[in-house]
């Protein structure tokens, strides 16, 4: 998108021109067609491709399959981080992200949750051969993102550290528009319900779930870490004399289009309880009778949970 007609100002026009030609060639050969369909299904399951149909019945099937990109805000125990690259010069392609969720269930059935977000900018080592104008090379640009953290429902924010202060965030210099701008009613209402907390963290509500938001700027060749600490009252029902088994589960949500994100979820339970069964099996480790940890690349939504028994 660096070389295009600036007067026409359609940097993505090549995609509109190329798509019908590419699809026609891919679907002509039966063998290629099968590989193409397998690739499309894989991309949809990993949220690299989102599908929308005007037919409501068909669209509902896409939602049920997880191919529509709908955010599951109604789920009680969400573990989600949404990242928006704003004036980040396409530098996300060089950034590794690690999400560490540490969930410690207390004897009173509350939970202490710590989320550690680490972003590492590998532009200088990976973008050496990138053929773009030197002044526009994203490998050597700051990675500027606005992140929204969606913790489990009812989470109370205890502390946050490591965020970039709003005054330190690079700002775009935009020209004065020729036409008068009219505030969008939905955006105005969304912003009205937000609260700015100490340090510049923002608390809000979107897509049926509460979130906490912050800026994060990572320079080329460096790492940046943000840590959130929450308390979740009445997080779950522990096994008891009258109900000797219970279940705890959380949905680790993958952001559509995201790549290079790795996640770790650690579940810790109090004395008197043991883990009878845990998921997922792939990437999961039973650290002890009362602790289960999952590690893996976040390629799709992943349910992490355990069946608990009273000892």
Language model features: what each stretch is:
Residues 1-311:
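Lumenal/extracellular ectodomains and adaptor appendage modules
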């Amino acid at each position: 998108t660096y070389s295009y007609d600036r007067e026409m100002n359609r940097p993505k026009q090549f995609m509109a021109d190329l798509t019908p030609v590419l699809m026609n060639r891919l679907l002509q050969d039966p063998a290629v067609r099968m590989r193409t369909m397998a690739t499309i299904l894989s991309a949809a399951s990993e949220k690299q491709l989102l599908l929308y149909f005007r037919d409501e019945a068909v669209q509902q099937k896409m939602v049920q399959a997880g191919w529509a990109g709908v955010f599951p805000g109604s789920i009680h125990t969400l573990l989600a981080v949404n990242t928006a690259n704003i004036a980040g010069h396409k530098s996300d392609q060089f950034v590794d992200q690690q999400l560490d969720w540490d969930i410690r269930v207390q004897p009173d059935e509350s939970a202490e949750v710590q989320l550690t977000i680490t972003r590492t900018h590998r532009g200088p080592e990976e973008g050496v051969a990138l053929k773009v104008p030197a002044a526009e090379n994203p490998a050597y640009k700051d990675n500027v993102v606005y992140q929204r953290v969606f913790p489990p429902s009812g989470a109370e924010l205890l502390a946050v550290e490591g965020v970039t202060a709003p005054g330190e965030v690079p700002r775009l210099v935009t020209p004065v528009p020729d036409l008068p701008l009219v505030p969008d009613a939905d955006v105005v209402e969304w912003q009205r319900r937000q609260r700015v907390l100490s340090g510049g963290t923002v608390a809000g509500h979107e897509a049926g779930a509460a979130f906490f938001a912050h800026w994060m700027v990572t320079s080329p060749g460096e790492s940046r870490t943000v840590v959130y600490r929450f308390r979740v009252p009445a997080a779950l029902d522990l096994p008891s004399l009258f109900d000797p088994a219970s279940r705890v589960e959380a949905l680790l949500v993958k952001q559509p289009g995201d790549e290079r994100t790795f996640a770790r979820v650690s579940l810790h339970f109090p004395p008197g309880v043991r883990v009878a069964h845990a998921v997922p099996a792939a990437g999961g480790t039973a650290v002890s009778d009362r602790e289960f940890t999952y590690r893996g690349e976040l390629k799709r939504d992943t349910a992490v949970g355990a069946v608990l028994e009273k000892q």
